[in-house]
Amino acid sequence: MATFAVTLGHGPRWDASRQIRDQRGWAEHARFMDGLVADGFIVVGGPLGDGQQTLHAVDAVDELEIRARLSADPWARAGLLVVAAIEPWALWLDCRRLAPEPRADSLTRGEQEAV
C-alpha cells in the first residue's frame, strides 16, 4: 500500500454556472466519496483554491486501482469529473502513524510495572 496525491478536475459536462453542490448528481457523488473515505481509500481531500480542482491523499496499491475505483464515481460516469493527475506521495509527516513506543529507561517505575 502506498499514498498518492490525486488531483481531480472538472469534466466536459461540468456546468460552470452552478456551484459544486448544485451540480447534477451531487448527492450520489457525495455518497460515493464518503464510501471511499469509510473504506480508508481516501485519507483526506477537498477543493483547491478557486474550486477548479480537488486534491485527495489516497491509499492504494497502484495507479490502476485508483483509476478503477474513481471511474465508478457517478460524476466520472456522467462526465462531470476527470482524473487530472496521480502522483506517488512520500509522506514524511503523517498523523495516522502511531507514536513511537517510549524508551523503557524514560518510564517511571509505575509505568514500567504497567507495561
Question: Where are the predicted features?
Answer:
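Conserved, structured core segments of small domains
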Residues: 1-115
